[in-house]
From Swiss-Prot:
SUPFAM superfamilies assigned to the protein according to its UniProt record, in alphabetical order: GatB/YqeY motif, Glutamine synthetase/guanido kinase
Record's catalysed reaction(s): L-glutamyl-tRNA(Gln) + L-glutamine + ATP + H2O = L-glutaminyl-tRNA(Gln) + L-glutamate + ADP + phosphate + H(+); L-aspartyl-tRNA(Asn) + L-glutamine + ATP + H2O = L-asparaginyl-tRNA(Asn) + L-glutamate + ADP + phosphate + 2 H(+)
GO molecular function: asparaginyl-tRNA synthase (glutamine-hydrolyzing) activity; ATP binding; glutaminyl-tRNA synthase (glutamine-hydrolyzing) activity
Record key words, sorted: ATP-binding, Ligase, Nucleotide-binding, Protein biosynthesis
Known EC number: 6.3.5.-
Membrane-crossing segments per the record: none
Subunit relationships: Heterotrimer of A, B and C subunits.
InterPro entries linked to this entry: Asn/Gln-tRNA_amidoTrfase_suB/E, Asn/Gln-tRNA_Trfase_suB/E_cat, Asn/Gln_amidotransferase, Asn/Gln_tRNA_amidoTrase-B-like, GatB, GatB_C_1, GatB_Yqey_C_2, Gln-tRNA_amidoTrfase_suB_CS
HAMAP family: GatB (MF_00121)
GO biological process per UniProt: glutaminyl-tRNAGln biosynthesis via transamidation; translation
Name of the protein described by the UniProt record: Aspartyl/glutamyl-tRNA(Asn/Gln) amidotransferase subunit B
Taxonomic superkingdom: Bacteria
Presence of keyword Metal-binding: no
Length: 483
């Protein structure tokens, strides 16, 4: 468990998260309007979205199905009876004067998700609920010095709000939870998890306490838009609360915003309670009643989920838990790996995928779907290493050319004459030459200077242009030098 260190001792973090995930749907939750990101302002707005008088909402069945599948992925209870409520508040980008949400009877509740901790153990985070609600529009304050404008394109887009219990004990655990949840949503296909575009947003409820004490007063940090900022925002807010308490002041329950530039939270408004919103069932919408048949059908349609894949990669492919988790975290990377793993050594493939391919993709700020190297060609590169056609060092050169051009590994090796030298007769000739040219080093090595062995290996590699088989060079050198 992580602690906040202060002059008076250690303080514990107590953190709960609320994740707002936009449902990947072509139309909105209660209207047929489109949901394309970055469309021109107010180009995807129906009379329902604009709350014109007499317009009635019609529930999008697909959004309901996506919420159910997400709930099943969270090992949660899917409620066969759920109700939409009106959450009443006024804001300029909420044309109805209320938000349609689910307060009393959510569609999903009582789920769990396991996350890795700093000790390497798994920790279970309880999911209180997942409910459906509509997103608000967007206020635009940078278009004019005199006016604010409203874009209702986002108004009415379906959201899943996923609420955890306050089981999270550090900023890093919060980040791990969000990363794992994002991965799950992408596998299920219910949300693309793109925090930069706002399709996944995080609110963090943060309080502090000394060990063994009751829960402290919590503050909510709204709309955190990146994994890194989740850590920064929670760290700052917790430290702020500790400083207040140690100075004899009280923590006021409030809603904050995090400023990514200053790294600080600032008060947005006092924290509302449920009573402030005057929730009541929406009279325009019938309760959602689900059958066992539908729930079972959606459960059967779920793909292999991240935890299942990790177990498979460990047992079937022999990967380490770490390697399996890194690959499975990105669904596209997992598909790429599985396609290539049928053609080569999975362990060696995983090593190259994580250390070389992911590294190059990060440098290029590219996704694996944009990679010019096909899974089949990547597997062929690994096979060339496996059968000693090329050395690991040469393979890195070949890989870099493949990444830039998309050329097949065998063609690059052939064109550039990079085949590894594994002929003992050829290597013995080179080794004899190295020994002949370096009598002092030979004498020093035989006199006990073992580190000189690396010098001889380096000389052989230099003379062969790095193409000598390293393992065979080591073996032959030891024979020649009598070690």
């Amino acid at each position: 468990m992580a602690y906040i260190e202060s002059n008076s001792g250690k303080w514990e973090y107590v953190i709960g998260l609320e994740i707002h995930a936009q449902i990947s749907s072509k139309s909105k939750l209660f209207s047929g309007s489109g949901t394309t990101f970055a469309a021109s302002p107010n180009s995807q707005v129906s009379y329902v979205d604009a709350a014109m008088p007499g317009m009635l909402p019609v529930l999008n069945e697909y959004c309901v199905h996506q919420a159910i599948k997400t709930g099943l992925g969270l090992k949660a209870k899917v409620n066969k009876y759920s109700v939409f409520d009106r959450k009443n508040y006024f804001y300029a980008d909420l044309p109805q004067g209320y938000q349609i949400s689910q307060f009393y009877y959510p569609i999903v509740q009582d789920g769990t998700m396991e996350i890795p901790t700093s000790t390497g153990e798994l920790k279970t985070i309880r999911i209180n609920r997942l409910h459906l609600e509509q997103d608000a529009g967007k206020s635009m304050h940078d278009q004019s010095p005199h006016y604010s404008f409203i874009d209702l394109n986002r108004a009415g887009i379906g959201l899943m709000e996923i609420v955890t219990e306050p089981d999270i004990s550090s900023p890093d655990e919060a980040a791990e939870f969000v990363k794992k949840l994002r991965s799950l949503l992408r596998y299920v296909g219910s949300c693309d998890g793109d925090m930069e575009k706002g399709s996944m947003r995080c609110d963090a409820n943060v309080s502090v306490r000394r060990k063994g004490e009751p829960l402290g007063t919590r503050c909510e940090i709204k709309n955190i838009n990146s994994i890194r900022n989740i850590v920064r925002a929670i760290e700052f807010e917790a430290k702020r609360q500790v400083d207040l308490i140690e100075n004899g002041e009280s923590v006021i329950q409030e809603t904050c915003l995090f400023n990514a530039d200053s790294g600080e939270t600032r008060t947005m408004r006092s924290k509302e309670e449920a009573a402030d919103y005057r929730y009541f069932p929406d009279p325009d919408l019938l309760p959602v009643i689900l059958s066992d048949e539908l729930i079972n059908e959606l459960k059967a349609s779920l793909p292999e989920l991240p935890d299942q894949k990790i177990d498979k990669y460990i047992t079937k492919f022999g990967l380490s838990k770490y390697d399996a988790e890194v690959i499975v975290a990105d669904e596209s990377a997992a598909k790429y790996f599985e396609e290539a793993a049928n053609e080569c050594d999975p362990k060696l493939l995983a090593n190259w995928l994580i250390n070389e391919l992911f590294g190059q993709l990060n440098k290029a700020s590219a996704e694996i779907s944009e990679c010019k190297i096909t899974p089949n060609d990547f597997a062929k590169l690994i096979k060339l290493i496996e059968d000693n056609t090329i050395s690991g060092k040469i393979a890195k050169t070949v890989f870099e050319i493949m990444f830039e051009t998309g050329k097949a590994a065998d063609k690059i090796v052939e064109e550039q004459g990079l085949v590894q030298v594994s002929d003992s007769n050829v290597l013995n000739t080179v080794i004899d030459e190295v020994i002949r040219e370096n009598p002092d080093s030979v004498e020093g090595y035989k006199g006990g200077k073992d580190k000189l062995f690396g010098f001889f290996v380096g000389q052989v590699m230099k003379k062969t242009g790095g193409k000598a088989n390293p393992g065979l060079v080591n073996q032959l050198l030891k024979e020649k030098l009598g070690s």
